Every structure is written in C-alpha cells, then in structure tokens.
Amino acid sequence: MKVNPNNIELIISAVKEEQYPKTELSEVALSGRSNVGKSTFINSMIGRKNMARTSQQPGKTQTLNFYNIDEQLIFVDVPGYGYAKVSKTQREKFGKMIEEYITKRENLQLVIQLVDLRHDPTQDDILMYNYLKHFDIPTLVICTKEDKIPKGKVQKHIKNIKTQLDMDPDDTIVSYSSIQNNKQQQIWNLIEPYIS
C-alpha cells in the first residue's frame, strides 16, 4: 500500500457522533497514553512533518481528529489517556467521547494502540487493550521510541509488553521509531487487509 503525502487532509475535529464525517472510507484509530507519540507516528507514516500537531505538553489532543489519507482510509487520532494533569471531569468527558466512537462507529476497522517500548505497559495501556478486546476490535500494537533501546534488547522489550498485555494471538505487535523511519511499509502492509 502506498499513500500520496500531498493528498492528506484533516477533515474534522469531532467531539460527538453527529460530527463524525459521512464517508464510506474505513477508519483506523490511534490510541495510546498521552505523549506516547501518536501525532509523531501519524506524521512519520504519511511522510509529512506537521500534519498532526505534536506537542511536548501531554494531553494536547482533546478531540477526535479525522485525517483523510489519500482517499484510501481515515486515521482517527484519539485523545491520549493517563495524563494526570487533566481534571477528573475532563478525563470522564474524554472517556465518554472515546467509548462512543469505539463502540458505535461502523467505519472503525482497526485500532493501533501505541505503547512506549522503553517501559512496561501502564495500567491504562492494559485497560485500553482489554477494552478493545472486550468489543472484539482488531488491534495492532505499535511500540514507539525503538531508537531509545539498544538493538539487542528490542525483542526482549517486545516480549515483555506482549506478555503484560496478555495479547490475543491474532493481534500483531511491532516496534517502531519515527526517527529511524524504516518500517512504514511494513505497517501499511499490516493495515491494508483491514481497509480493503
């Protein structure tokens, strides 16, 4: 699967179902802890530096951001979870918004859950993965920040994350670095069966 980086647009930033775009395209949602690198991952996958706004400050994405990727699929950037400085009310609001999208959106075909390769999955990572499995949503786990781990230890970290998430044997786990930028094609190939 190839995408044209010049044919990508943010369609809408939505907070409720009525605002979701009316389209036939399959959707791939990106979920993960605040600051796990969702926006950086999107930018690196589509070969554009600033399409998805990145921030050093966790918890910046507060809406469901729908990106039309070359008329082939839609990436949906979901607000990050597990950010302590967000108020309880705000967290509940995000939770409702994410739940409504994940449980009701028929276009949703796959969730890419991003976890930090350097650390054990957090309680929130485990809850999110279990939540997706409860609703039988196909999930691709991507371990970000691969460049921060010595090459010889990457597989050990992947195995640890797989074990702690108690991953479904049908789900795939891949390590990724937005800096090394060398696995986009492998990931597009993993996404492709869900959107065709």
Swiss-Prot record:
Residues 24-196 form the EngB-type G domain. InterPro entries: G_ENGB_dom, GTP-bd, GTP-bd_ribosome_bio_YsxC, P-loop_NTPase. It comes from the Bacteria. Mg(2+) binds at S39, T61. Keywords: Cell cycle, Cell division, GTP-binding, Magnesium, Metal-binding, Nucleotide-binding, Septation. One of its GO terms (molecular function) is metal ion binding. It holds the Pfam family MMR_HSR1. One of its GO terms (cellular component) is cytosol. Its cofactor is Mg(2+). One of its GO terms (biological process) is division septum assembly. GTP binds at residues 32-39, 59-63, 77-80, 144-147, 176-178. Necessary for normal cell division and for the maintenance of normal septation. Belongs to the TRAFAC class TrmE-Era-EngA-EngB-Septin-like GTPase superfamily. EngB GTPase family. HAMAP family: GTPase_EngB (MF_00321). This is Probable GTP-binding protein EngB. It comes from Staphylococcus aureus (strain MW2). The gene is engB.
